[in-house]
């Protein structure tokens, strides 16, 4: 479903510049308990789950809780955010993470359960250092940029033993 479809659904709050890649699932049972800030990206197959159906088998009620995602947040592919979680501004959730507790602003978390790995500043410094010794590619090296066979072969060869960066 697109961001436009989401915005109209039962009071789900979504900020500006929200990007949701394919396969994401935003809890259709309790969308009004989910708030997504500005400039947020949900990578492929992210799940935002505001209820715990397993509790119903035990106590007759589903546990529910709000999910609040701050501004400038990236949530990596196949991550799951569980009920009663706040993800602070300027944070990154690594791929395949399960977020069971609040994530402070300005950190990178990863794992199951998600734990702090480093600060955003440390992450940025690490990336910048890596960029100094890695191939860097412009927009024309993407499908959207109309990459051709020659550029694909060049990129594939250059990335044989290292990673690189694309705009």
Give a label for each model feature.
Residues 1-11, 114-167:
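Terminal amphipathic alpha-helical/low-complexity segments used for targeting or macromolecular assembly
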Residues 6-8, 12-117:
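Structural signal for interior beta-strand "rungs" in well-ordered beta-sheet cores
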């Amino acid at each position: 479903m697109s961001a436009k479809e989401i915005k109209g659904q039962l009071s789900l709050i979504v900020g500006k510049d929200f990007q949701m890649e394919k396969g994401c699932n935003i809890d259709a049972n309790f969308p009004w308990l989910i708030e997504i800030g500005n400039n947020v990206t949900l990578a492929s197959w992210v799940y935002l789950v505001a209820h715990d159906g397993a509790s119903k088998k035990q106590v007759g009620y589903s546990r529910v809780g709000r999910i609040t995602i701050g501004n400038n947040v990236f949530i990596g592919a196949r991550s799951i955010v569980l009920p009663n979680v706040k993800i602070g501004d300027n944070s990154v959730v690594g791929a395949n993470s399960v977020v069971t507790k609040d994530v402070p602003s300005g950190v990178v978390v990863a794992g199951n359960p998600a734990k702090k790995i480093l600060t955003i500043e440390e992450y940025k410094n690490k990336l910048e250092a890596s960029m100094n010794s890695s191939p860097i590619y412009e927009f024309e090296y993407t499908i959207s940029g109309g990459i051709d066979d020659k550029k694909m072969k060049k990129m594939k060869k250059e990335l044989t033993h290292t990673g690189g960066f694309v705009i």
